[in-house]
Amino acid sequence: MYTLKQDRPHPVPPPPPLTMDHLQHGYSTNTPVTLPGIPEAARSVSTVYEGRIYSLDVVQQPIRARMCGFGDKDRRPLTPPPCIRLIVRDATTQKEIDINEIDTSFYVLTVDLWNAEGTSEVNLVRHSATSPSISTATSSAYPPPANIMPFPQYAQTHGYPQTAYPPYYGGQPGYNPHAGYQYPQGGPDPYYPGLPAASTYYPPGTPTQALGPQSALGPHISSASTGMFTRNLIGSLSASAFRLTDPDDKIGVWFVLQDLSVRTEGSFRLKMNFVNVGTQSQAQDQSPGGTPSSPVINVGSAPVLASAFSEVFQVYSAKKFPGVIESTPLSKCFAFQGIKIPIRKDGVKGPRGGQSHGSKGQDGEGEDWENEG
């Protein structure tokens, strides 16, 4: 009989995996790198397109807002209003292009609501039809149906902030721009079949009956949840470009999101996507007279040229809301140029305590406002 030796050494365990600090600097540039303190999913993305580099700079970040619930009469906008500057640089010289050389006629910025980690959309919120209280609301990470978006769904990109090939805001590269949308049959309204109101809809691929346990949303939606989905972020979810001058007297291309509200409380981020929905070859199209032809709307797919996340902002309930943010110099500067931004008064009162100028209004907490422009 043979006996095992008790003093036999144990097998040497495998070495632990190397961290980013131990990797050599010669690794492939196609590997995404996560910066300390910045979630990889929440990083900005810029693209090189037709010899130009497009990027977004969220100059004025949203800080807080009061939740507006599921009614449509008590809208509470984010404060301060997000202001995003578009930066266009030459791909060869890396210098910013003069604004007079940029045609912003069809520049559009769209906005979505994301969770605080920047990992998933929370554009939809579900609430019970029988108990429409705020406590029954739950956010959903499922995106809205593709056939009700102003543009088709675009492909998400990850990796380095600057990529040579932009994602397409019309689907994958095989998308047929002439195929058109396929609307569901048998409904009175192709966008909202069988629904009484346009602000409420069922998730994609779901019949108009109550959601069952085998619905396309996954196993976590049970038959007991007969609620309906509605948008959590409401208001103007897209904005056109404006040529505005900042407080430093520098003109630029700006997008102002002054009409955004959130239905439920919590911590969120905004994701902004910049798209040029005009013809992409308008600079090369020449009329018989030798002058550039006027830009026209792009009937096909359009690439997402840049995207950016806002910082985390907080949405409070009515009891916990600390109040609106004081009007910033940037908001006042843009309001003076005609942008409809509600400006908080600085204690200037007229006769009998009334306002000396501007339209009178209150935000519900006794705060006086005046609407410029």
From Swiss-Prot:
InterPro entries: Velvet (IPR021740), Velvet_dom (IPR037525), Velvet_dom_sf (IPR038491). Residues 1-26, 344-373 are annotated as: Disordered. Disruption phenotype: Leads to predominant production of large tuberculate spores with severe viability defects. Residues 48-344 form the Velvet domain. It holds the Pfam family Velvet. PROSITE patterns: VELVET. It comes from the Eukaryota. GO terms for cellular component: cytoplasm; nucleus. Its main location: nucleus. Induction: Expression is increased at higher temperature (37 degrees Celsius). Keywords: Cytoplasm, Nucleus, Sporulation, Transcription, Transcription regulation. GO terms for biological process: sporulation resulting in formation of a cellular spore. The keyword Zinc does not apply. The keyword Cell cycle does not apply. Residues 364-373 have a biased composition (Acidic residues). Residues 1-10 have a biased composition (Basic and acidic residues). It is found in: Nucleus; Cytoplasm. Component of the heterotrimeric velvet complex composed of LAE1, VEL1 and VEL2; VEL1A acting as a bridging protein between LAE1 and VEL2. Forms a heterodimeric complex with VOS1; the formation of the VEL2-VOS1 complex is light-dependent. Component of the velvet transcription factor complex that controls sexual/asexual developmental ratio in response to light, promoting sexual development in the darkness while stimulating asexual sporulation under illumination. The velvet complex acts as a global regulator for secondary metabolite gene expression. Component of the RYP2-RYP3 heterodimeric complex that plays a dual role in activating genes associated with spore maturation and repressing certain development-associated genes. Belongs to the velvet family. VelB subfamily. This is Velvet complex subunit RYP3.
